[in-house]
Amino acid sequence: MEKPCTLLVHFDKGSPSMANEIKADLEGSDVAAKVDAMKRAIMLLLNGETLPHLFITVVRYVLPSEDHTIQKLLLLYLEIVDKRDVASGKVLPEMILICQNLRNNLQHPNEYIRGVTLRFLCRLNEPELLEPLIPSILANLDHRHHFIRRHALSAISAIYRLPHGDQLLPDAPEVVERALTGEQDASARRNGFLMLCACAQERAVAYLLTNAERVAEWPDLLQMAAVDLIRKVCRSPNRADKGRYIKIIISLLSAPNSAVVYESAGALVSLSSAPTAVRAAANTYCQLLSSQSDNNVKLIVLDRLHELRASHRDVMVDVVMDVLRALSSPNVDVRRKVLDLVLDLLTPRNVEEVVMYLKKEVVKTQAGDLEKGGEYRQMLVQAIHSCAVEYPEVAGSVVHLLMDFLGDTNVAAAVDVVLFVREIIETNPKLRVSMIQRLIDTFYQIRASRVCSCALWILGEYSLSLSEVESAISTIKQCLGDLPFYTVSEEGESTDASKPAQPVVNSVTVSSRRPVVLADGTYATQSAATETAISSPAVAPGSLSSTQNLRSLILSGDFFLAAVVACTLTKLVLRLEEVQPSKAEANKASTGALLIMVSILQLGQSSYLPHPIDNDSYDRIVLCVRLLCNTGDDVRKVWLQSCRQSFTKMLAEKQFRETEEMKAKAQISHAQPDDLIDFYHLKSRRGMSQLELEDAVQDDLKAATGEFTKDADDANRLNRILQLTGFSDPVYAEAYVTVHHYDIVLDVTVINRTKETLQNLCLELATMGDLKLVDRPQNYTLAPESSKQIRANIKVSSTETGVIFGNIVYETSNVMERSVVVLNDIHIDIMDYISPATCADVAFRNMWAEFEWENKVAVNTVIQDEKEFLDHIIKSTNMKCLTPPSALDGECGFIAANLYAKSVFGEDALVNISVEKQADGKLSGYIRIRSKTQGIALSLGDKITLKQKGGSS
């Protein structure tokens, strides 16, 4: 396994008797037995057996065979057998015996034997064996069969790339170039062209430019090789022919092969930043997006479009509608990426067209699969919400359509709709009247408690005119139904007093005022729907039921919603007193509201529900009752103005945060004032094409804005060097750790500090945790006071803290035993795998409820300020705080915040911090971590436990 090999087959260890059986079968005349014996011999050799005496047997009894299977196995055997003497490093003398056989095979009348022999020569590294075969190999370039010519070109390429291959085939590039001129086979042309690309790039470039007009007609294999060559050539400083290369790439954008088209688009973007070139690449990606059915291909293409958006947003804006057409894919991940990309490309010019397209998609979701349609509809609602917030003028065209989905069976989608309505009604005063009327009309359809709560708040805050207030109160009363909420049957009172008292069955009469929709779509004018239940329906708040409305939600025990109803009615009555000229009507409405509140309190304190009313909801409703009985001006101002002002302030802060984040992203480095400037009009006199001209100007712009300059990271690299041994150890070692997404690379520098040569020096590593070593350790010889760079690759499969430990083992001439130097442990930090991320509050709560792994860490710190402690945890965990700064301001003795991050493996890490200051000034509380996997929850908990004790260290 230490040697490079192209073949790997597992086989159990053999025995001497098996070696004798193989030898006997090879010496026999049975072809099938010979085939089986050759297979066993190959598997034994691959798994470490030497079989030293078998080679002569193979030469005597297998070499002369004409059977194709035996000849193929013979070549595999010759490929893996040791051809050099271990001690001297020279080719074994008996190996010369196979040269004549190989020469005969290269001249064999059977094309298959010639072809497989040429393919075998591609993996032969001994010049002594190859040199006698060179004339035969070259002769096969003129063979009539393309199979042989193809492998002859591959063999010439492999031989020429050997350490002394240019001595074996000094004129190989000229020979291959001549062969290419008359070659018609696609694979043969590709093999020859790749040989020129690797060994004689200038000849490959000359061949490409000579055939530039015909590249579009080349076979796809050769086109891919041409694209790779252009990438390599244009990386070099000499870019005189760049315009010709770009023309070739543009001609390949219309190639029939999708892989060629994709690679050409990527090459075009890397070659040129001119708007014309970028636009051509973007259009090509959009065509691939619509023509390819594989979702993985769509996701890859969308990633490329995201990269283009980051550097060429102005050009990408023109293809936004083409990108939107990818929403026809049923895959949720594709749709999500499309919407994310489109939202980044919104402009005042295209926002209306985008929103109209999204509206059509929303309507389509009603006819599709209910489950998938709900999730897709939620994404569309969020996208439209973002459009309307950024460009308020489009809100009016979509808000009424979306309000039809307030009663959506997908609660998350309905919540997104009502939050959208709440924000738009505040930011677009012109839409307030129509939105309030629409909300009143659709309020009966709402089935989710959270949606009801938000809708009631909207009605209480934004119903301003007399008709709006009266309609809102009437709607709430109708949804609550008849009062009281229950009646006690008195049948038990008529029983004979002499009989034992029987348990009284209490019935709850529930009346529903939900409007009935008839077959023709109109509302029924009469309803006699009354249902009697022995006990209240056990329906959890926020769950879905076909008969669920405001009344049934409250009867299910949702007293938080009942408290919201009480607050909304209080606001509406207070506003009615301001807009209603008739005092009697206002008092009548106030009395009706009080009756509803008292009925709710009575229901909450009764024994008919499984759970009584909670104290918070009870206090809230009682406060509303007292307020309506005795209202002061200050209290009226708080209820009618302060709540809305708080919401307005929250929206303003949200907008400010988003603006600041956009400004931070837009920060780019600038060039120095004395940098050279080229003028566009002066350049136009050079006779350049329009595309070359645009490209040159774009390069100048990039240089002027500092886009070409990368910050030097050398100082940061030094911080990641870990000392593995002490300075007094005979072998000093230090490692530089590079963390990639799925692997860790250790670049270990080993220094021999002694005056002796260290032999068989080996870096032995082991891992703990979800880490796995990829390479087997190798032995090295280290001269006195010299150094060696050793690289070790470690595979990572999950976000979990791991430990790498090991030692360095070596031998010296003076000491018989092997010496060992133990290395310091290398701890792989979870912080290398997680990065700050954002998500909506609704998504955070859904994940919090869904994730099963929780790690609860008690607060134990010397920090005495809550905000300082929160900042310390955020810095230590590399997470983003989702709680807005306004919610964290002020001194109140406690703090609660949510943190969020994503790992490179796509895992979500959720943290909730709840801290309270004690009387002695110390902080107490808990930090709860939730994730889908155990590893990230435990590792993050260990990190927090380790970091929270210190101050800002």
Curated annotation (Swiss-Prot):
Any one GO molecular-function label of the UniProt entry: structural molecule activity
SUPFAM superfamilies noted in UniProt: ARM repeat
Chief site of localization: cytoplasm
Species for this entry: Oryza sativa subsp. japonica
Keyword terms, alphabetized: Cytoplasm, Cytoplasmic vesicle, ER-Golgi transport, Golgi apparatus, Membrane, Protein transport, Repeat, Transport
Protein name per its UniProtKB record: Coatomer subunit beta-1
HEAT repeats, residue ranges: 49-87, 93-127, 128-165, 314-351, 393-430
Matching InterPro entries: ARM-like, ARM-type_fold, Clathrin/coatomer_adapt-like_N, Coatomer_bsu_C, COPB1, COPB1_appendage_platform_dom
UniProt topology in membrane: Peripheral membrane protein
Domain of life, per lineage: Eukaryota
Subcellular location(s) per record: Cytoplasm; Golgi apparatus membrane; Cytoplasmic vesicle, COPI-coated vesicle membrane
Keyword Transmembrane: no
